[in-house]
């Protein structure tokens, strides 16, 4: 099975303000928005999703941008954002494939209850996030 692109992850200091910017500036539909996480999809006219009076989607569009809160300015520096995030069926095999292709791990593989998570740096410096859902959990869980 090939990897499935989940979203482009942008690290933010103020997630609600950033979601408002993308909604108002680009017409993206805000599917989820909390103080620490937001998901934005294609414009309502392109997906059939209908935004409510506040501009937030009543139905979930395909996610194209995810916003994640960070406190540290270092995490927002070049090389940490954006992060390409993928859902994979076999994280260990995918990590090995990427390491052989020239990537390097950026920290240990983590094993939270919802599945396995790994962060890697591609040879060109871009960050990749991998997520393998735990058996019986939804593949849509956040990295």
Regions found by a protein language model. Give the residues of each.
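Short amphipathic alpha-helices within nucleic acid-binding modules
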Residues: 20-21, 92-97
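Short hydrophobic/aromatic beta-strand element in the GNAT-like acyltransferase core
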Residues: 39, 85, 117-119
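Conserved active-site alpha-helix within GNAT-family acetyltransferase domains
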Residues: 16-25, 118, 127
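Conserved short beta-strand elements that form part of the metal-binding/catalytic scaffold
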Residues: 29-78, 127-133
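Short glycine-enriched loop/turn motifs at secondary-structure junctions
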Residues: 2-4, 76-81, 111-112
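N-terminal beta-strand motif that seeds the catalytic metal site of vicinal oxygen chelate
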Residues: 1-19, 82-84, 134-143
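Conserved acetyl-CoA-binding loop of GNAT-fold acetyltransferases
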Residues: 24-30, 102-104
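Vicinal oxygen chelate
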Residues: 95-143
């Amino acid at each position: 099975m090939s990897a499935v692109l989940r979203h482009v992850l942008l690290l933010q200091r103020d997630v609600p303000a950033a979601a408002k910017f993308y909604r108002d500036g680009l017409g993206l539909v805000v599917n989820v928005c909390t103080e620490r996480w937001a998901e934005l999809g294609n414009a309502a006219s392109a997906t059939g999703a209908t935004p409510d009076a506040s501009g937030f989607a009543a139905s979930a569009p395909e996610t194209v941008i995810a916003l994640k809160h960070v406190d540290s300015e270092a995490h927002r520096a070049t090389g940490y954002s954006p992060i390409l995030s993928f859902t994979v069926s076999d994280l260990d095999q995918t990590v090995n494939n990427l390491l052989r292709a020239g990537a390097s791990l950026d920290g240990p593989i983590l094993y939270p209850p919802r599945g396995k998570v790994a962060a890697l740096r591609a040879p060109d410096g871009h960050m990749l996030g991998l997520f393998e859902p735990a058996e019986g959990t939804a593949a849509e869980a956040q990295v």
